[in-house]
Amino acid sequence: MKLSLDWMNDFTPLKEVGLDAILKKIAISVCEIDDATEFRPELDFVKIVRIESLEKHPSADKLQIVQVFDGSSKSQIVTGATNVKIGDLVPLAIPGAKLGDKEILESELRGVKSSGMLCSEKELFLSEEGNGVWILNGLDQAEVGKTIRSFLYYDDIIFEVDNKSITHRPDLWSHFGFARELASQLRLPIVFNPFESLWNFDLSVKLPKVLENQNAHSYYASSISGVSVFPSKRKFQSRLQKCGVRVINNVVDVSNYVMLEMGQPTHFFDKKFLENQGEISLEVSFAKKGESFALLDETSPALEEEVLLIRNQGKPVAIAGVMGGKESAVQNTTTEIVMESAVFMRERIRKSIRSTGIRSDSSVRYEKGLEATTTLPVIRRALNLLKENGCSELKASEPVGFLHIPHKEVRIHTDIHFINAKLGVTLSQGDITDILERLHFIVSWKGEHLEVLVPKFRHNYDVTIPEDLVEEIGRTKGYDTIQVSPLLAEVKTPIRNLNRELERKCKTFFAIALKYHEVFNYSFQSYKENEFSGDPKLSVKIKNEMPEEQSVLRNSLLPSLLKNTRTNQDRFSEIKIFEFGRVYFNLPEPENEKKIFAFAVSLDKKSSEPDLKLLEEDFLKIKKEVESFLESIQIYEYTWKIQQETIFHPGANLCLVARSGKDGLETIVGNLGYVHPAILDSFELKKRVIYGSFEFERIVELWNQNRKVSRFVTPSQFPEAEIDLSILVGEKENTNVFTDLVKLERIPELKEGWVYSQFMGGNVPEGKKSVSYRFRLVNYERTFTQERIKEISDQLVILAGKNGFVLR
């Protein structure tokens, strides 16, 4: 938004303060200023001069030598203009002037010196057309020696305000509103208030009819006669041009002028056009779907039912608050008009803008929410401006219409301690009263409590709560005057959040050490997906209207991870993903919600493939990854047990069991296995998937038990050794049985043992499987000898034989 300093000076003496002080106060206490620039400063180098003499150029038939006088000295100009004569007042660009990309210099034309250039309106960028030199004879205030900038009222500073910073302040979207704010901040008086304009309405002028309804907060119309349409006076033209508004004629320009001055849009209808439709009967109503009519911008959009219209005799003449109709607009022959001044619901205007795609200066102000009681004062001010702009025989009827939302007092109660505590300063009652009364609030005190009456131009959506008053006081005092001091607080060791700490460790280990990718999924899924793991009858149904595929809260992370896998299965040969999420059950607390850590690994083939050795190796590899994570957080006491879960392949699933709590009871911490082929098919998965799911709270509990026990052992400086041993065990027998027996032998050098491969078929007896174990040996005192390694190997072989295991 552009604001003219000269225009605002009509209301308060800003020019007495100085530009730097104004800009500083605006930046600190009001809003952001994008720029503050002089308007057309180059025109200071163009003066009004009088032609003293004319003579032919001795060497060029189409040129003339002109002697001009600027009030203090004479100059010689060579020109090709043919429309000038002695005594004419014309604009002269003196040497040093820059007009566009052209710089005026002293020069010689065919041997004759020329000290400047006589200019047309086009050369001064005042018009798109220029037929010869601009003749200023008879124009008001066209005086010899005056600069064109001063003559055109262009001697001004234009502020460009960042609109986003005043979206909440509709009272600042006008010159008077902004000047009023600056007067409050700079302790200046208001010398003229346009809202206090007076007008004697004429009872002889026929009244228009306005149909009352609830589609507007306020709507008034006045019938005006004695109108003459011609170009606006230079003051009106210059002020509109400086604010980036196109000049049209003296009537339409007043409508734009009063909007920029007071922030209240108005509209003028051609009265004769309205009367041709029948008796004038204006109404605010909604459009019919597909309805259209020609607008001022030459468009005729097909309207939706949510668009608000102004109708006369049921026929549309304007889109309310957005744009007027072309046929009802003021014409050059117009002698009578009907003036509209209204305030519409901001929500309605926003819908009209969205529906039509039309965003005008009027609609920008309406969508912010205007004060409904300003409509009548604006009519009186507009009538005065019409008269000032040339309509000297003006007569106007008493405005007719309605006001549905009269001014309601907004009172805010607070106390001095609240204000000082929020600002971090100590203000007295006098300080607070001074600031608020300068901002036009009315303050009354009862002890340390105060009651504040909000001015009517601020109570709409703006100042409504005590915190708003704190902001008003703080910005007016100046945030730069509030001393910055560090917050003083007792330094305490933060409470350790084990859940968050372990979650971070887990994410780091799986993402960095094991190369998994973390995924995030919604907690909503379908009732059918809840059937895969758990009792679907325990599903928690979402009360909101949701599509069937998002109708319940999930009871497992499996469906989400399988869908992630399906999305990526054609892009990657191997997928390793994990997720931390919550699952929900229709059970009493605390069983109604659990935090789960789960992962899915998709490899090359489905679990129906005959290469069982490869399947076993992959499974053992993932199992080893889980064990390495448990070891990284110092959890060593656990076992894997076979357990049948419907989501897993019958022959490939384990549960992780550990002792936890004071009673030391065994509890299931999680599950690991190949996802059942039927489930893979239902999710359209082409590859086999290993899925692991663990109750995170159980892992946290185990970690908390074990983290307090120091298990650090200095790494051995001697090479480690490994022993591999393959034995036959029952097809359905737990492979951990043998490793548990080995642990009971308490071999001092034995660090750990694990299954690294399994095999069935071939020459392995039916009902049996070949299991290969690997044992890691560490000696902290000496290098292993072959004899010692053989002793340990023989001890393991004897142990296997004693317990009925056959060597392979």
Curated annotation (Swiss-Prot):
Residues 716-808 form the FDX-ACB domain. The keyword rRNA-binding does not apply. Binds 2 magnesium ions per tetramer. Its cofactor is Mg(2+). One of its GO terms (cellular component) is phenylalanine-tRNA ligase complex. Residues 407-484 form the B5 domain. Keywords: Aminoacyl-tRNA synthetase, ATP-binding, Cytoplasm, Ligase, Magnesium, Metal-binding, Nucleotide-binding, Protein biosynthesis, RNA-binding, tRNA-binding. It comes from the Bacteria. One of its GO terms (biological process) is phenylalanyl-tRNA aminoacylation. Signal peptide: none annotated. It catalyses: tRNA(Phe) + L-phenylalanine + ATP = L-phenylalanyl-tRNA(Phe) + AMP + diphosphate + H(+). Its main location: cytoplasm. It is found in: Cytoplasm. Transmembrane segments: none annotated. NCBIfam families: pheT_bact (TIGR00472). Belongs to the phenylalanyl-tRNA synthetase beta subunit family. Type 1 subfamily. This is Phenylalanine--tRNA ligase beta subunit. It comes from Leptospira interrogans serogroup Icterohaemorrhagiae serovar Lai (strain 56601). The lineage of its organism: Bacteria, Pseudomonadati, Spirochaetota, Spirochaetia, Leptospirales.
